[in-house]
C-alpha cells in the first residue's frame, strides 16, 4: 500500500476538488494511459487494486507507471463513539484526483492488451475514466 514516509502534519482538512488538472494531464512515460474524467478522492487500496489488475492482465510484460500518490490522510472515529471530543485518528490515505489527470500509464504491450488491461483497472476505481493513447510522431 502506498503512503508517505513522513508528513508535516498528522491530520488534514477535508477540502474540495476544484477545476481541472493542469499538471499531469498528458502522457509523460508510456504509450497508453488511463485519464480521470471526474473529480474524486482515490484511496491507496483502490490504486493498489487497479495496479494488480493491470499487471495481471499484462502477464508481467511491458511497464506500468502510477502517476497519482495518496498523500492526504483521512481520519475516522471508531464505531459507536459519540460526536465531539476531537477529530478521529488517521485511518487511510487518499489522492485527490482532478478531471483530466492521467492516473496510470503503460508501455511495451499491444493496443488491444493495453485497452483491456486499463479497462480492468478502471473497474477498480470510483471515477469515470478514459483510455488515452500517444499520437504517433
Swiss-Prot record:
PROSITE patterns: RIBOSOMAL_L16_1, RIBOSOMAL_L16_2
Record flagged with keyword rRNA-binding: yes
Gene3D superfamilies: Ribosomal protein L10e/L16
Transmembrane stretches, start-end: none
GO terms of molecular function: rRNA binding; structural constituent of ribosome; tRNA binding
Keywords: Ribonucleoprotein, Ribosomal protein, RNA-binding, rRNA-binding, tRNA-binding
GO terms (BP aspect): translation
GO CC annotation: cytosolic large ribosomal subunit
Database matches in InterPro entries: Ribosomal_uL16, Ribosomal_uL16_bact-type, Ribosomal_uL16_CS, Ribosomal_uL16_dom, Ribosomal_uL16_sf
Subunit structure: Part of the 50S ribosomal subunit.
Functional summary from the UniProt entry: Binds 23S rRNA and is also seen to make contacts with the A and possibly P site tRNAs.
PANTHER family xrefs: 50S/60S RIBOSOMAL PROTEIN L16, LARGE RIBOSOMAL SUBUNIT PROTEIN UL16M
Family, as annotated: Belongs to the universal ribosomal protein uL16 family.
HAMAP family: Ribosomal_uL16
Name recorded for this polypeptide: Large ribosomal subunit protein uL16
UniProt lineage: Bacteria, Pseudomonadati, Pseudomonadota, Alphaproteobacteria, Hyphomicrobiales
Gene this chain is encoded by: rplP
Amino acid at each position: 500500500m502506498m503512503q508517505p514516509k513522513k508528513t508535516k502534519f498528522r491530520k488534514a482538512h477535508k477540502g474540495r476538488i476544484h477545476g481541472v488538472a493542469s499538471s499531469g494531464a498528458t502522457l509523460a512515460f508510456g504509450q497508453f494511459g488511463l485519464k480521470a474524467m471526474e473529480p474524486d478522492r482515490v484511496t491507496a487500496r483502490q490504486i493498489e487494486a487497479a495496479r494488480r489488475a493491470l499487471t495481471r492482465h499484462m502477464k508481467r510484460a511491458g511497464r506500468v507507471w502510477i502517476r497519482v500518490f495518496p498523500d492526504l490522510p483521512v481520519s475516522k472515529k471508531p464505531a459507536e463513539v459519540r460526536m465531539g471530543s476531537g477529530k478521529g485518528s488517521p485511518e487511510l490515505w487518499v489522492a485527490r484526483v482532478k478531471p483530466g489527470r492521467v492516473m496510470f500509464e503503460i508501455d511495451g504491450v499491444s493496443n488491444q492488451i493495453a485497452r483491456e488491461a486499463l479497462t480492468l483497472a478502471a473497474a477498480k476505481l470510483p471515477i469515470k475514466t478514459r483510455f488515452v493513447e500517444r499520437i504517433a510522431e
